[in-house]
C-alpha cells in the first residue's frame, strides 16, 4: 500500500517527461481505479486484507531494485490496466454509488475506463448509468434504446420515467426553439406513451391508479363517511395524500346524489384539487339534510315568479307590443311568467293573466332560509318594500293573516318580526311620485262650457333618438297630468304602456266586459304589480283578453301615415255606450279651438278638481260650436322633442286611419292650428252621429305636407286655416288642399 504514493514521487525525481504525458492521458483510468479500490475496501475486510497483503509482497520484492532502475516507473504504470480485473458486481456497485451521489461526470469517466465487454455485459445499474450519461450528452436516441432494451425493476420506474419524459421535452424544445407549456407537455405525453419496460401498465386517471381506486371503492361500499383515522390509513395504503382521499369521498357522494336525482353523471374520479373542508367532521345526518336545501336554492336563484291563483295559461303566439319605437314579438320561453302569455317589455318577457298577485323575487346572498315557527300558528313573510316617495327600501316581516304589501315584494331572509332595515337593493329604480287619480263613473262625460287650459312641459327621460326614417314612432309618457279618454265597447283588446307605479292610469268600472290592458314599462322590477280589478294597488286590471294586443304608435307605410291609437300613459280610460254601426264616420269642417302656446283645453269631469291639475290652470272660452258637442284635447307640448321629431314630408297622399290596425271609437282625432303637433280628441256627446275630425296646424316650411290624392291641385291660400283632410272610408279625399 505504501508503494502507490511512492511511485508518483519517484517519477518526477527521474525527470522523465514521458511519465507526465502518460499520467495525463490515463487520468480517467486512474480515477476509476481509485473508485474501485475504495469500493473493494468497503466490501469486506477479508478481501481487502488479502488484496493488501498481495500488494505489499509485490512492493517488497520490487522495492530494493526500484530506485536503481530508471525504467521501473513506466512498467509500474503499464501493469495496472492489464493486471486489474473487476467483477460485474463490483462495476454495478460503483455505478449504483455514483448514481445515488448524482455525479454524472465521474460516472461518465468511469464507464469510459471500462472494457467494451464490461459495458456491453452491464447489469441493471450499468444500463441505468449509461442512460443517465446518454441524457447528459443529449443522445436521446441512445437513451430510448437503452430504456426499451430490457424491463427494469419497479423500484426504479419513477426515476426512469422522469428521465424519459425530460428527454422528450428537451428534444421538442430543441426542435421548436422555444420552451414548452403545460399543454405542449401534455400532448407529448399523449403522443409518446411510456415504454412498457419502465411502466407497470396501470393507467393513472387524475392522479389515481387502478389499485388506489379499487381500495377507495371498497372502503366506500362499507362506509360512506370514514373517520379521519380511516382516511389516513387509506392514504398510506394507496399512496395518496389525505386531501386526495377526502376529495374522492366527497365527490363520490355528490355523484351518487346527482345520479339518484336524475341529473347528468359527473366525471369518473376527483381531480385531486386541495380543499380546506374536511367532511369527516360533519355527521351523515347533517350532510343529508343539507343536500335538499342546496338543490332547491340552486333552482330558485336567478328566477322571477309571479304568484297567481290558477295554473299558467298557454301563451299566445301572436302577442306583441310596441316598446321604444319598435315591435317586439314574444317568441320562445319567457324569462318571467305572469301566469299567461309572454309580452316583452325592455328585454323582459312578461305575460298576460286574469288574476295576478304581487311580484315575488327570491332573495340572494347565500343566507339560510327562514325557519318555520315552532307553534305553527302563523307564517311570517319577509319582503323588501320600496317607497316611491322617499326612495328607501324597507325589509319587513308580516304574518300571513295580515294583508299583502302593495307593490313589488322580494322574498328574502330578514330580521325579527316588525323590524325595519334600510338598505340598497340592486337594479331597483323607484318610479315617479304618486299623482292624484280621479276615476270617472261609467257613462258619457257631461259637456262643460269652459274647458281648462293646462300648460305642459316636456317629460324628462323621453327618448329622443328617433330618426326621420324610423318606421315606428312610440308616444308613451307624454302627458304627466290626468286625462279622460272615452272608448266604446266595440274596441278590441288594447294595451297601454304605463310610466311606473306612480302613474295615475286606471280603468273605470263598466257594466260590460273590459278590454283594456295596462302594462308597466318602468325600469325597476318593483313597479310590476298587476292585481285583479277588486284588489287594491297602484294599477287596476279588469278582465284581460288574451290574443294579439293593439299596439299604439305612428307608422309610415308606402308613403302613407297611419295614425294608430296613441294615448299618453297618464290617463283615465272609461267605456261608454257602443257607437253607431258602421266603421265609416262622416267628417265635417270645423273651426279649431285657439289655445296659447303649450296650452291645452281639457274637458274636466266633476271628479277632477282644479286643485290636482298640473301647472297653471286658466279658463278660456271656446269659440262658438254646436250645443250638443264639446271638444277635449289631448295635450302634446310643442317643445317636446319626442313628438314627431323631424318627420319627413311624405308624398302627397291621403292621410288615413286604418280600420284593420286600430280600434274605432266615438272620440275623434284632430290636430289644431293653435299649437304645433297638438292632437285633439273630440267626443260627440249629443244625439247626432259621432264623427271624427283630423286637423293639422300651421306648420313651418319643414313640416308635414299632406295633400289629396295624386293629380290634385294645391291651394296656397289655406295655410292659416285648418281643413278636413280625409274621411274614415276607403275613398280618397274629394277636396284637395295643402298647408
From Swiss-Prot:
Tissues in which the protein is found: Expressed in adult but not in fetal eyes. Found in corneal epithelium and endothelium, lens epithelium, ciliary body epithelia, cellular layers of the retina and the sclera.
Name under which the protein is recorded: Homeobox protein SIX5
DNA-binding feature ranges: 201-260
Subunit description: Probably binds DNA dimer. Interacts with EYA3, and probably EYA1 and EYA2.
Illness association: Branchiootorenal syndrome 2: A syndrome characterized by branchial cleft fistulas or cysts, sensorineural and/or conductive hearing loss, pre-auricular pits, structural defects of the outer, middle or inner ear, and renal malformations.
Any one Gene Ontology BP term: lens development in camera-type eye
Keyword tRNA-binding: no
Nucleus recorded as keyword: yes
Leader sequence segment: none
InterPro entries per the UniProt record, alphabetical: HD, Homeobox_CS, Homeodomain-like_sf, SIX1_SD
One Pfam family of this chain: Homeodomain
Any single Gene Ontology cellular-component annotation: Golgi apparatus
Free-text function comment from the UniProt entry: Transcription factor that is thought to be involved in regulation of organogenesis. May be involved in determination and maintenance of retina formation. Binds a 5'-GGTGTCAG-3' motif present in the ARE regulatory element of ATP1A1. Binds a 5'-TCA[AG][AG]TTNC-3' motif present in the MEF3 element in the myogenin promoter, and in the IGFBP5 promoter. Thought to be regulated by association with Dach and Eya proteins, and seems to be coactivated by EYA1, EYA2 and EYA3.
Source organism (scientific name): Homo sapiens (Human)
Family affiliation: Belongs to the SIX/Sine oculis homeobox family.
Biased composition (Basic and acidic residues): 279-289
Record keywords, A-Z: Activator, Cytoplasm, Deafness, Developmental protein, Disease variant, DNA-binding, Homeobox, Nucleus, Transcription, Transcription regulation
GO molecular function: DNA-binding transcription activator activity, RNA polymerase II-specific; DNA-binding transcription factor activity, RNA polymerase II-specific; RNA polymerase II cis-regulatory region sequence-specific DNA binding
SMART domains on file: HOX
Subcellular location: Cytoplasm; Nucleus
